Amino acid sequence: RIMINSGETIDFSGLNSFVADKHSTGGVGDKVSIILGPILASLGIAVPMLAGRSLGHTGGTIDKLETIPGFNTNLTIADFKNNVERSGVCIMSQTESICPADKKIYALRDITGTIDSIPLICGSIMSKKISEGIDGLVLDIKIGNGAFMRSLSQGKKLGTMLKLSTETIYQAIQQSLHTTISTRQSRKGEISS
């Protein structure tokens, strides 16, 4: 609550639609947020996404988007709200005015070896998402090599600490990567069944 109250909150109650965000705990090759936001918006769901930069070895959603020339993720709250109202989806980077306490802690986690601290992860995720004024949240907890949650038990612990009542699908991050690579190679005729 202290991190939420350290800055402004956003009010989307004037929208005539369900307001949801998607957050990932991060992992190598994670691009789900970039794809899922527009899909949900096409279904009439308003999707304000307050996304993060890299922590540790993974690139954050904002880092990926900023590789596109001219793509602006540094928006005012008013511009953010206008974009969501106009197009149904908007992704912006964390600002000085939304959860500034979290922004400072987030930067410190990267240099203090506390990136994988589950209580700090919970506080960081939920303070930003509550500040967005959303009705629902899709939380993508990545597990396995290349993710912050190395094991299924760590992923479950994070979900439990977030007090999520969820429908859960567990799949290790390296499994989907292997399946994708195998499928591509099979199409090229490089792997036989």
Set out the residue ranges of the language-model regions.
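A glycine-rich helix N-cap at a beta->alpha junction
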Residues: K64-C90, M161-I169
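General beta-strand structural signal in soluble alpha/beta enzymes
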Residues: D21, V47-A51, T73-T76, I91-Q94, ...
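Glycine/serine-rich anion-binding loops at beta->alpha junctions
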Residues: F18-H57
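A glycine- and small/hydrophobic-rich beta-loop-beta segment
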Residues: Q171, S176-S193
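Flexible, glycine/charged-enriched surface loops at secondary-structure junctions
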Residues: T9, S13, L137, T168-T179
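Acidic, glycine/proline-rich low-complexity segments that act as flexible tails and inter-domain linkers
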Residues: R1-V28
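Divalent-metal (Mg2+/Mn2+/Ca2+)-assisted nucleotide/phosphate chemistry catalytic cores
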Residues: P69, K81-K157
